[in-house]
Amino acid sequence: MATVEVEQVTPVAVENVEVPTKTVEETVVETEVTQQPEESVPAVTEQKSEAPIVETNEEVVVEEAEKKDEETEKKTEEKDEKTEVITETPVVEEEEKKAEEVTETPAVVEEEKKTEVVEEKQTEVAAAEEVAVEKAEE
């Protein structure tokens, strides 16, 4: 809690001061009361017609509030579904592409290695044959 300091100011007492008093004269005005109720009755009915008052039960109010809540929940769920569809689709496609790349790359590398090994063997065999031919010629 906060503490609040308050300074009290006391007015200085003034001596021998006369305070003038105002005199008010009340005037009595007599009016005819018989015409006023007739005019005020239509005014009251006009107010009722402009803004009718409807009595409601607590159950009705609760039901209306629940309906509004359900409508807002449905709207938010629809928005969530739309955003989920948008975000899920690209992620799934990227994962599939990565999986394909991973599976294709080792297969291609292995095939290239196999072809290189075969080519090396062929060159070695050819070189060995050339050496054998040269030795035979000598």
From Swiss-Prot:
Transmembrane segments: none annotated. The keyword DNA-binding does not apply. Induction: Levels follow a circadian cycle with higher levels during the night and lower levels in light phases. Accumulates in darkness within 24 hours, but repressed by light and the product of photosynthesis (e.g. sucrose). Induced by sucrose depletion, but activated by glucose, mannitol or sorbitol. Triggered by gibberellic acid (GA) and salt stresses (e.g. NaCl and KCl). Suppressed by a high concentration of calcium Ca(2+) and of other metal ions, including magnesium, cadmium, manganese, nickel and zinc. Up-regulated by cold treatment (e.g. transfert from 22 to 4 degrees Celsius). Sequence repeats lie at residues 62-68, 71-75, 92-98, 109-114, 118-122, 131-135. It is found in: Cytoplasm, Cytosol. Keywords: Abscisic acid signaling pathway, Calcium, Cytoplasm, Repeat. Signal peptide: none annotated. One of its GO terms (biological process) is response to cold. Predominantly expressed in roots (e.g. in endodermis in the stele) and stems, to a lower extent in shoots, flowers and siliques, and, at low levels, in leaves. The keyword Cytoplasm applies. Binds calcium Ca(2+) and may act as a signal mediator to buffer Ca(2+). This is Cytosolic calcium-binding protein 2.
